[in-house]
Amino acid sequence: IFFSRDSRPGDYQWPNNTNRLLPWVFSRLEDLTRSDYEGIPSNALPSVSGDALLFELSDGEYLFAKAIAGDNSLSWFQVNQDGTITLYISTLGEDALNGQLPLLLIRKSSSVYHVFSDAYHSLTADNAAVPTLRKRTDKQYFDAFNYLGWCTWEHYHFDIDETKILNDIDAIESSGIPVRYILIDDGHIANKNRQLTSLVPDKKRFPNGWMRIMNRKQADKIRWIGLWYSLSGYWLGISADNDFPPEIRQTLYAYNGSLLPGTSTDKIEAWYEYHIRTMKEYGFDFLKIDNQSFTLPLYMGGTQVIRQAKDCNLALEHQTHRLQMGLMNCMAQNVLNMD
């Protein structure tokens, strides 16, 4: 089994833009490169660049091999048309690879279940090597996710506004269905050419900001309200034409047509502290942070690419925890986000 994303023509490939990580079954590796490989009808073929491999060996044992990330390096597999496989490691930018770097995690077991658990337990057990990785059983969901919720995306996609949401809250409450949280999922962001311009929502769609919607929270009805955002601003980063205060603008730098948090860890932390604190002050209880694996192509080609992209994830986790905000991580299925 080869683990990679589904491939779409003209789209970014691994290690970027990984919305989901899928198991692609093969008898021979070149099967994955064939045009008649039975993929997913909606998105066609597997990406030939990916995260991990699982082999059933001739002696009945299983071998699991997984690409891993370092402080400023990233590895990944590529399946070639001749049935060979290449393991790459790169900084994805101007920096050279230096010193001793993590490259690959390998485990073997007679059980297909144990080979996975042994591999990940070895990572979580090494706090010095991977201090931020924890087992799912050691994590707690935000309280709201123990209840039934409603997400605007499934009904409206981008076509939302204050009136629609308020009307739907009325409908939910009158229905008697025990919905206890709602998620406002995209369609609200102030942007210019898909770059973030403000943390104030689109004024045409939400003329009163979030106040009227937040006033609808009740302990025995809709108790929590969450909001969608993208990790790096909006889909294509942060616009130079923004309304952020001067001290926040100083945490951003211009690169490849957009502004990005960085370059130092402190500046990245300051940007996410401002971002999360603003959402908390608006009254939101949790955030869905999307587009996480697309952070890499925004930084790619520069310096300290992996480190900065990883710092964005770490700062997001740190600030949501510190400010007691719930968090959904979305489009985060690549080596950097998972490890």
How should each PLM-predicted stretch be described?
Residues 1-126:
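N-terminal accessory beta-strand-rich subdomains and adjacent acidic, glycine-rich linkers
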Residues 49-52, 84-107, 137-154, 205-216, ...:
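Short, charge-rich amphipathic segments
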Residues 101-117, 121, 152, 160-166, ...:
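Glycan-recognition patch characteristic of GH18 chitinases/ENGases
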Residues 178-339:
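Aromatic- and carboxylate-enriched substrate-binding clefts and catalytic-loop regions
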Residues 130-164, 168-171, 179, 186-190:
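An acidic-aromatic substrate-binding cleft motif
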Residues 43-62, 169, 173-201:
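N-terminal start-of-domain structural block
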Residues 125-138, 210, 271-275:
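Alpha-helical scaffolding within the catalytic cores
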